[in-house]
């Protein structure tokens, strides 16, 4: 472990779980109680998909998806110990720490993404939280990418209120900060950042007037109840996130979650469907893990209400289907890419 990683105080997993249970229990009058969400998960598969597709059609064109591209603008060396992440300095996953990319490199990637049909460009940096000196070059990236006509999103770790406002002033459209999992399961995955830390950052983003991109990861060994708990936390935000990425764990050798039993594919589709029903107006994004999904499974995810995919060869440090394969699949399903005449 490097010195940067050692500077972060580690909270015991049990303390995190206890705090999460006490602090983040949903009120009795919550819009979606965990039991209600769990009842959706328990519906017969066809009934659940039928209901999700109905909700989807009431809010979106069911045959259109948004293509998003995600670029790692600062890779590796992160001080956090997220058990799924190869970019953590706590894990020996073979990811080298790199410095922040230059503006010209980022703009070249953004131009290529737009030429390939993406209408949304996301930039991720492996920081616990950005230092103020890091923010100015990121704001330059946001301004220049936005000037290309692309929707902008960044994920930089925890933010202070004033940093969120600076990003808003730079024209940022979305800020991504995932909850990852339910409050109860959280301490088994991360011990260097509390659930409340995540909620505080989301609050700063919302207060600054930036759209919230917030979702989670499934397939980390959690129970169905934990998946229901994650969705309930998201759906009870006021308002719920405009953008909800659902990731299927990509297991990377050298991370603590390597070797975790894989999630049943139909359970992943159920998670997409439940997200669509509980957050009807959100963009539900089919995110990490798509490379391991066959075309039939991806088609079921679209039926369940997913209306965005991450597009390009890499998602931060993990693989993703080739753009040509994605275009061919969408064409076979008669699904149009938003804003792309291809």
From Swiss-Prot:
Question: Which GO MF terms are attached to this record?
Answer: 2 iron, 2 sulfur cluster binding; 4 iron, 4 sulfur cluster binding; biotin synthase activity; iron ion binding
Q: Where does [2Fe-2S] cluster bind?
A: 122, 153, 213, 285
- Which Gene Ontology terms describe the biological processes this protein takes part in? biotin biosynthetic process
Matches recorded under Pfam families: BATS (PF06968), Radical_SAM (PF04055)
- The EC designation for this entry is 2.8.1.6
Name the positions where [4Fe-4S] cluster binds.
78, 82, 85
Enumerate the UniProt keywords alphabetically. 2Fe-2S, 4Fe-4S, Biotin biosynthesis, Iron, Iron-sulfur, Metal-binding, S-adenosyl-L-methionine, Transferase
Recorded hits in SUPFAM superfamilies, A to Z, give: Radical SAM enzymes
Sorted alphabetically, which InterPro entries does this protein's record hold?
Aldolase_TIM, BATS_dom, Biotin_synth/BioAB, Biotin_synthase, Elp3/MiaA/NifB-like_rSAM, rSAM
Gene3D superfamilies for the chain: Aldolase class I (3.20.20.70)
The note describing how and how many cofactors are bound reads: Binds 1 [4Fe-4S] cluster. The cluster is coordinated with 3 cysteines and an exchangeable S-adenosyl-L-methionine.
Q: Tell me which cofactor or cofactors this protein depends on.
A: [4Fe-4S] cluster; [2Fe-2S] cluster
What reaction does this enzyme carry out catalytically? Answer: (4R,5S)-dethiobiotin + (sulfur carrier)-SH + 2 reduced [2Fe-2S]-[ferredoxin] + 2 S-adenosyl-L-methionine = (sulfur carrier)-H + biotin + 2 5'-deoxyadenosine + 2 L-methionine + 2 oxidized [2Fe-2S]-[ferredoxin]
Q: Where is the Radical SAM core domain?
A: 63-290
Pathway(s) it belongs to = Cofactor biosynthesis; biotin biosynthesis; biotin from 7,8-diaminononanoate: step 2/2
Entry similarity comment: Belongs to the radical SAM superfamily. Biotin synthase family.
Main function: Catalyzes the conversion of dethiobiotin (DTB) to biotin by the insertion of a sulfur atom into dethiobiotin via a radical-based mechanism.
What quaternary arrangement does the UniProt entry report? Answer: Homodimer.
**Protein name, entry field:** Biotin synthase
> Per the UniProt entry, what species is this protein from, by scientific name?
Cupriavidus pinatubonensis (strain JMP 134 / LMG 1197)
Gene that produces this protein: bioB
């Amino acid at each position: 472990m490097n010195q940067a990683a050692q500077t972060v105080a580690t909270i015991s997993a049990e303390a995190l779980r206890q705090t999460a249970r006490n602090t983040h229990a949903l009120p009795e009058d919550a819009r979606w109680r965990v039991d209600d969400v769990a009842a959706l998960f328990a519906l017969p598969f066809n009934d659940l998909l039928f209901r999700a597709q109905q909700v989807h059609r009431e809010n979106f064109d069911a045959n259109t998806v948004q293509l998003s591209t995600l670029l790692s603008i600062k890779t590796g060396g992160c001080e956090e110990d997220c058990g799924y992440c190869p970019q953590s300095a706590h894990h020996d996953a073979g990811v080298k720490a790199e410095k922040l990319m230059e503006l010209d490199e980022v703009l070249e990637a953004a131009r290529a993404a737009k030429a390939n049909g993406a209408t949304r460009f996301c930039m991720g940096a492996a920081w616990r939280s950005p230092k103020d000196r890091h923010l100015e070059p990121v704001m330059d990236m946001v301004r220049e990418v936005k000037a290309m006509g692309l929707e902008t999103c960044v994920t930089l770790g925890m933010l202070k209120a004033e940093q969120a406002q600076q990003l808003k002033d730079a024209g940022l459209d979305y800020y991504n900060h995932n909850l990852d999992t339910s409050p109860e399961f959280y301490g088994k995955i991360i011990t260097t950042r509390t659930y409340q830390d995540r909620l505080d950052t989301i609050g700063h983003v919302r207060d600054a007037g930036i759209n919230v991109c917030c979702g989670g990861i499934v397939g980390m060994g959690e129970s169905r109840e934990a998946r229901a708990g994650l969705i309930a936390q998201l759906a009870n935000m006021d308002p719920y996130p405009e953008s909800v990425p659902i990731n299927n764990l990509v297991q990377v050798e050298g991370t603590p979650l390597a070797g975790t039993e894989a999630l049943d594919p139909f359970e992943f589709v159920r998670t997409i469907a439940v997200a669509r029903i509980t957050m009807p107006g959100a963009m539900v994004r089919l995110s990490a893990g798509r490379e391991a999904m066959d075309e039939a499974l991806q088609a079921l995810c679209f039926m369940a209400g997913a209306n965005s995919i991450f597009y390009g060869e890499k998602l931060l440090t993990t693989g993703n289907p080739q753009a040509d394969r994605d275009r061919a699949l969408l064409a076979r399903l008669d699904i149009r890419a938003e804003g792309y005449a291809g």
